[in-house]
């Protein structure tokens, strides 16, 4: 096979320097067809096609780009087609099974492996038979009675070697098929679960958490690979046992049935243990799902948890679930240990019973029969050893299959009817439509008897108070709700902008283009109308900058504009926009409305949910919702004249009915805007190459010793040491038992000879030898049982400790870690990696130690008995170490790349589940399915290549092991006159086992190293940067700190990461106790950075912040954050109960919670339910509207009774009514607090004591509002003017009223017609 590595330097130099450069760029097999597909019969038989790749891995650090293309028959596209047909047949059955469908699709391939494996199994029985004949040959040669050819020993050597090699060839061909079949079943689960996830109905989604879905594609899918890896061993276990027993009977007669009786007696116990395993595993998986679900939720909301100093509460939530999971894991492990211990002890116990009975019956031992029988008993260890593993994995596979089947049978979303009537214009048509979020729940919110049309070139606006059903109407149009009655139809393509923008982890341009072809002219136009050009100029990489997961390096307004730009660029026919203007600045909102919605989209059907009353006069039609029903519709003026619900709604917003909307667009302001040079600080910065999300790094070289040490100490070093001593005692006692059998037979023969010669026999009697044999054998059994229990007990403790360390370490990580690390990558640690540590790693380590100690014992034993064997053994050992050395480079590289290529699958799943509504709206299902297939193909390429390398090594190790057997026969033949028959039997019986043990031992070593990569990856997260301590014992604030709530910023400089430009540049100011400070500024000016610095989510680079004269840097983070309160822009609720969301530490009595709910006007909502404070909150609070979520978050702040409150654009995403309620509650309840308000709506802060205007990370202006407005060239003046002429007048009156000391309610009565007339100013 041609080595695709770089050729020798000399060869390249003859071609000139340019040629060298050209060749050096092409490393490995990247882009080439898989050599396995092109290889001939001999190359496939010996796996020699992999030779060049092994050398390549030795010379280079392996990269994914070095791998060849995945074979066509292994690609996801091919597998998807195969399973689709099979599942279509299966789903028609009363009780469909996905596993059965998989067997139907790929079972024929597995039949080929059965054929090869049957030949391999047959070859295993040749060795013991030749052993018996070899002993007979030696005995007869010694006695001179042999009638066979004197060279027969050499012929036996060739026969044993030849049949063993045939068996090896067949075994690895069988393995080639089983591995592929297991991987195919794993792949189709990942593919079909993904497809199903983007089709699930809303009721199905509400009952299935993202954590559960991730578990299906990680743990459950992985079971297929694990089971198929040993499936043939299990299928042939019973035939092997029967054949072994039959041959045993042929050798030693009826004592065989004594051993059989022991095995039969163990079956009920094994069956009971297997039953318990099944029950425990099923419950255990449910607990694992729950733990992963909560962990995923916490990781997504880590910023909020840190801001509230809720780490302890949520740690308890996860660790309690983990403790319950560990209890079940202990139970599961103990039942599995019983199986392993019993089946591990049965061969030894059977040997003792069989040989004791044989001796008792015959009165002597025949070396040929005894050691031939011993070989058969050793053969029994293989099927018996695999049975507990197969039972455990089989149970897990059965449960996994059931879970996957149940998931795939969940109801799917019914797509909205596509209208193809050419006479109808594009638009949305709803006729007598009654829909609900969840049909299964009677109290589920929905829409009633909706008749709605939005068609042609029109702008329809949807308004209503909080909880009226505005977003529900949008979801119904998209087909996300379940239809009870009526019809919903859409003509034309759809573009959708959700209330909370969905951003993918890609470049800014890719987020906008969203898979469509690039039309540069349209793209530039879209950037202009969506007000993104200035933002793009701020990034050094322009629109090629990478947008982090969930858009973490963009502000809320930027994310929303990117979302709008995606919709506009799609050039759809119908635009459904769910309150997109709430998250953007006022002047940007006006620009978007006039330039985008009424500009570039003027020829489209636009449906706009809005809380901005001032834009209603520009709508062609307005729809008013109340309690899930349309109560009014018409133009703005028609609705005003009707004086019905719309008029009441205007009063809630404080708008005079006679007022006209501000009909100016931003053309008039553009000149002023251009004159005022915008100095805006960059948003969270990415690195110089444009990347923000860090690539997952693969460690190079062997797994470090400290990783193994980490695992050793995790479960208790002394317990591990105790288990290791027991491993040695177990191997030693078993070897000694077999050696004693040989010694007994030799001594028995010598006693017989002495008696025949009339001499006094020496040594122990046969009965004494029997007693020692039984005693040592029983000790061996006891050691095996104790070792098994102690080691697996240790393993569960280690798993518990590692999870505890990992979770606690993540809670202490700085926010920059979560900004740069995709959620899917972190979740992978808590699913796949932790599953390996929980369930698999201990088995691999135990098998590795058992096998390698057995090999070592064999080599020592046969070298002592046949010293001449050391001559060929030396080069064999050298070859073994060379092969193993080369293989480890290959194996390590592939293992790590396989692990790295697995994370993108989880990342993509996570991203898809967050944006499934957008994906469906834009009809991007197939595009995302192809992305999933590409990621899966990359991962499968690594995995299948790794398995091919295992076969490459295995065959060569088998060859070396078979050589040991061959040379053992050769030297026994050479020394047949001096070697005892019992030693011949002992040497050959052990030599026969060395091939399997050596091969399995090395592969287990590689497998153990692979699984240790999980410990290594988790250790990477345990190490690394951490936040400051939660509590500093010798520097704690007084219990009543802060008493006043004064804040001082002293030359504060802050940057997001070392090496990046500062985002806050020398902030210096003093805020007096109880002052109400408004903070304004353009996007990226540093408003939210002030909050991050105050809460120390990012530490100051220079300068300081003091509260009540105390430098906050000297306190622990918990002491600081628990004494502050924040109402963030995006309201975050957690699955659980209302009580848990309000009071995670359960510190407040019920009456206090109800009192707070009264204050925010939500008590009626919950008092009307039976659960009350225990009302269920679904994941992300999806069973509440955004306005209700924000009110609940306000209630959290009220319960804290803080001296300092921060409002971080807290009312940006709520309607005017909710905004008014929140503002009134804050004024009333927090009058004695210092309040910092980062505002989008200037009317919420114009009555502040002072306003801080930030520009480019510096304080541009800081004074009373009225004073600042006297400066006609000031930035605040410009921002006020941007809100529109009438609203600017109102804002100035607010500032003047504040200066003159008038009450805000008086101001409202004086000038109510101006209140919120135009866009509530957004900054």
Curated annotation (Swiss-Prot):
Membrane topology: Multi-pass membrane protein
Chain spans, region Disordered: 657-695
UniProt key word Lipoprotein: no
Start and end residues of each ABC transporter domain: 428-652, 1047-1281
First-listed, main subcellular location of the protein, grouped into a coarse class: membrane
GO molecular function, one term: ATPase-coupled transmembrane transporter activity
Pfam families linked: ABC_membrane, ABC_tran
Keyword line: ATP-binding, Membrane, Nucleotide-binding, Repeat, Transmembrane, Transmembrane helix, Transport
Descriptive protein name: ABC transporter C family member 12
């Amino acid at each position: 096979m041609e080595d695709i590595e770089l050729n020798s330097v000399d060869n390249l130099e003859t071609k000139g320097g340019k040629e060298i450069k050209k060749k050096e760029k092409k490393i490995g097999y990247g882009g080439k067809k898989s050599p396995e597909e092109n290889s001939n019969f001999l190359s496939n038989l010996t796996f020699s096609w992999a030779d060049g790749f092994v050398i390549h891995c030795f010379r280079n650090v392996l990269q994914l780009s070095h791998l060849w293309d995945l074979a066509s028959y292994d690609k996801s596209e091919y597998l998807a087609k195969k399973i689709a047909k099979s599942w279509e047949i299966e789903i028609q059955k009363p009780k469909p099974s996905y596993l059965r469908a998989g067997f139907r699709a790929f079972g024929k391939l597995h039949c080929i492996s059965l054929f090869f494996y049957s030949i391999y199994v047959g070859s295993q029985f040749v060795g013991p038979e030749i052993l018996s004949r070899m002993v007979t040959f030696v005995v007869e040669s010694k006695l001179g009675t042999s009638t066979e050819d004197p060279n027969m020993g050499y012929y036996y050597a060739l026969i044993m070697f030849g049949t063993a090699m045939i068996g090896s060839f067949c075994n690895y061909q069988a393995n080639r098929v089983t591995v592929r079949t297991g991987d195919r079943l794993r792949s189709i689960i990942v593919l079909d679960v993904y497809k199903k996830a983007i089709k699930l109905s809303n009721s199905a989604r509400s009952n299935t958490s993202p954590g559960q879905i991730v578990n299906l594609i990680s743990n459950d899918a992985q079971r297929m690979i694990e089971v198929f890896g040993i499936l043939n061993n299990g299928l042939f276990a019973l035939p092997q046992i029967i054949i072994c027993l039959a041959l045993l009977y042929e050798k030693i007669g009826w004592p065989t049935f004594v051993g059989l009786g022991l095995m039969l007696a163990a079956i009920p116990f094994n069956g009971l243990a297997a039953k318990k395993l099944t029950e425990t595993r099923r419950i255990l998986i449910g607990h694992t799902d729950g733990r992963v679900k909560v962990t995923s939720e916490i990781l997504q909301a880590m910023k909020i948890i840190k801001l509230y100093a809720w780490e302890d509460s949520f740690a308890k939530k996860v660790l309690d679930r983990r403790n319950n999971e560990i209890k079940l894991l202990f139970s599961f492990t103990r039942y599995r240990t019983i199986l392993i211990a019993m089946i591990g002890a049965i061969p030894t116990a059977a040997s003792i019973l069989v040989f004791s009975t044989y001796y008792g019956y015959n009165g002597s031992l025949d070396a040929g029969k005894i050691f031939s029988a011993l070989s058969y008993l050793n053969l029994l260890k293989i099927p018996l050893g695999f049975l507990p593993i197969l039972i455990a994995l089989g149970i897990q596979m059965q449960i996994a299959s059931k879970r996957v089947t149940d998931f795939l049978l969940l109801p799917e979303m019914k797509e909205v009817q596509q209208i193809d009537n050419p006479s109808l214009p594009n638009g949305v048509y709803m006729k007598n439509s009654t829909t609900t979020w969840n049909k299964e729940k009677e109290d589920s919110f929905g829409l009633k008897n909706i008749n709605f049309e939005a068609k042609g070139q029109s702008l329809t606006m949807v308004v209503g108070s909080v909880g009226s059903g505005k977003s529900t109407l949008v979801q119904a149009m998209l087909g996300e709700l379940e239809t009870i009655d009526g019809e919903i139809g859409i003509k034309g393509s759809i573009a959708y902008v959700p209330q909370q923008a969905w951003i993918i982890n890609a470049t800014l341009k890719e987020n906008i283009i969203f898979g469509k072809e690039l039309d540069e002219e349209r793209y530039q136009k879209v950037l202009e109308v969506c007000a993104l050009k200035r933002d793009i100029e701020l990034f050094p990489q322009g629109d090629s900058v990478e947008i982090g997961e969930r858009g973490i390096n963009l502000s809320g307004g930027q994310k929303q504009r990117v979302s709008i730009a995606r919709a506009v660029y799609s050039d759809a026919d119908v635009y459904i926009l769910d309150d997109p203007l709430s998250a953007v600045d006022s002047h940007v909102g006006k620009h978007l409305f006039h330039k985008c919605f009424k500009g570039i989209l003027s020829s489209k059907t636009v449906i706009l949910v809005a809380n901005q009353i001032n834009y209603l006069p520009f709508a062609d039609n307005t729809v008013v919702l109340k309690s899930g029903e349309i109560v009014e519709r018409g133009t703005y003026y028609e609705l005003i004249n009707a004086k019905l619900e719309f008029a009441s709604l205007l009063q809630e917003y404080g708008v005079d009915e006679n007022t006209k909307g501000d009909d100016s667009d931003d053309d008039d302001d553009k000149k002023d805007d251009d004159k005022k040079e915008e100095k805006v600080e960059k948003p969270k910065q990415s690195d110089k190459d444009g990347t923000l999300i860090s690539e997952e790094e693969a460690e190079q070289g062997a797994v470090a010793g400290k990783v193994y040490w980490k695992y050793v100490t995790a479960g208790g070093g002394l317990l591990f040491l105790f288990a290791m001593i027991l491993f040695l005692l177990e191997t030693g006692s078993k070897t000694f038992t077999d050696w004693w059998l040989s010694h007994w037979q030799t001594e028995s023969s010598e006693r017989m000879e002495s008696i025949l010669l009339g001499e006094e026999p020496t040594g122990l009697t046969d009965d004494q030898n029997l007693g020692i044999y039984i005693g040592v054998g029983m000790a061996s059994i006891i050691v095996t049982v104790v070792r098994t229990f102690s080691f697996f007990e240790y393993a569960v403790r280690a798993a518990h400790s590692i999870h505890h360390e990992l979770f606690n370490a993540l809670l202490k990580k700085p926010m920059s870690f979560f900004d740069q690390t995709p959620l899917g990558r972190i979740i992978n640690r808590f699913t796949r990696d932790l599953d390996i540590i929980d369930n698999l790693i201990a088995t691999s380590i135990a098998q590795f130690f058992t096998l390698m100690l057995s090999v070592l014992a064999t080599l020592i034993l046969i070298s002592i008995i046949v010293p001449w064997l050391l001559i060929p053994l030396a080069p064999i050992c050298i070859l073994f170490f060379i092969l193993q050395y080369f293989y480890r480079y290959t194996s390590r590289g592939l293992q790590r790349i396989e692990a790295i290529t697995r994370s993108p699958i989880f990342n993509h799943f996570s991203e898809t589940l967050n944006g499934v509504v957008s994906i469906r709206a834009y009809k991007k299902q197939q595009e995302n399915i192809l992305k999933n297939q590409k990621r899966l193909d990359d991962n499968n390429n690594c995995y299948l290549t790794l398995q091919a390398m295992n076969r490459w090594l295995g065959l060569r190790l088998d060859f070396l092991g078979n050589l040991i057997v061959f040379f053992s026969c050769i030297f026994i033949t050479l020394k047949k006159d001096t070697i005892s028959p019992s030693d011949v039997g002992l040497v050959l019986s052990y030599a026969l086992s060395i091939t399997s043990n050596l091969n399995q031992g090395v592969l287990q070593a590689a497998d153990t190293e692979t699984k240790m990569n999980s410990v290594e990856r988790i250790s990477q997260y345990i190490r690394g940067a951490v936040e400051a301590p939660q509590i500093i014992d010798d520097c704690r604030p007084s219990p009543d700190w802060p008493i006043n709530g004064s804040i001082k910023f002293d030359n504060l400089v802050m940057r997001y990461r070392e090496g990046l430009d500062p985002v806050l540049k020398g902030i210096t100011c003093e805020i007096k106790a109880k002052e109400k400070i408004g903070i304004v500024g353009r996007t990226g000016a540093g408003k939210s950075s002030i909050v991050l610095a105050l809460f120390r989510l990012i530490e100051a680079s220079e300068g300081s912040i003091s509260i009540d004269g105390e430098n906050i840097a000297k306190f622990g983070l918990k002491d600081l954050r628990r004494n502050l309160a924040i109402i963030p822009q995006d309201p975050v609720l957690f699955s659980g109960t209302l009580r848990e969301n309000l009071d995670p530490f359960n510190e407040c009595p019920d009456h206090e919670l109800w009192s707070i709910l009264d204050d925010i006007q939500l008590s009626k909502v919950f008092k009307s339910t039976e659960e009350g404070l225990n009302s269920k909150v679904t994941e992300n609070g999806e069973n509440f509207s955004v306005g209700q979520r924000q009110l609940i978050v306000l209630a959290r702040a009220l319960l804290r009774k803080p001296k300092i409150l921060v409002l971080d654009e807290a009312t940006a995403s709520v309607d005017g009514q909710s905004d008014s309620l929140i503002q009134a509650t804050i004024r009333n309840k927090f009058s004695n607090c210092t309040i910092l308000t980062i505002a989008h709506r200037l009317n919420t802060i114009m009555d502040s004591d002072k306003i801080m205007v930030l520009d480019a990370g510096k304080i541009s202006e800081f004074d009373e509002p009225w004073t600042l407005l006297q400066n006609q060239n000031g930035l605040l003046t410009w921002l006020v003017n941007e809100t529109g002429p009438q609203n600017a007048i109102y804002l100035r009156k607010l500032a003047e009223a504040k200066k003159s000391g008038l009450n805000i309610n008086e101001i409202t009565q004086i000038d109510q017609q101006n209140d919120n007339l135009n866009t509530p100013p957004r900054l």
